[in-house]
């Protein structure tokens, strides 16, 4: 996906609750721990796409709010930050 666009979409829709940096805004909302989570999927962006589309626990589903390509771009961006 388009990482630059994914960063823009992330900033506009996800950054209020999530951080992709090691410094955490809130313990539960940081994606820093996603590095180990994402490693379980061997770089498969589909797991991120699924969670963003369908939501989980307190996180709302963005499937009706964002276009499929925007969600794919967010997944690419998050995965790029997870290293």
Curated annotation (Swiss-Prot):
Modification note: Binds 1 heme c group covalently per subunit.
Cellular location(s): Plastid, Chloroplast thylakoid lumen
GO BP annotations listed: photosynthesis
Stored SUPFAM superfamilies: Cytochrome c
Binding-site residues for heme c, renumbered to this chain: 14, 17-18, 59
Subunit description: Monomer.
Protein name listed in UniProt: Cytochrome c6
């Amino acid at each position: 996906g388009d990482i630059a666009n994914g960063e823009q979409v992330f900033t506009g829709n996800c950054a209020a609750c999530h951080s992709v940096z090691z410094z955490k805004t809130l313990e539960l909302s940081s994606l820093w721990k996603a590095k180990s989570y994402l490693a379980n999927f061997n770089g498969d962006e589909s797991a991120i796409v699924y969670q963003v589309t369908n939501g989980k626990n307190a996180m709302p589903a963005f499937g009706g709010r964002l276009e499929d390509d925007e969600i794919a771009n967010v997944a690419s961006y998050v995965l790029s930050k997870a290293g």
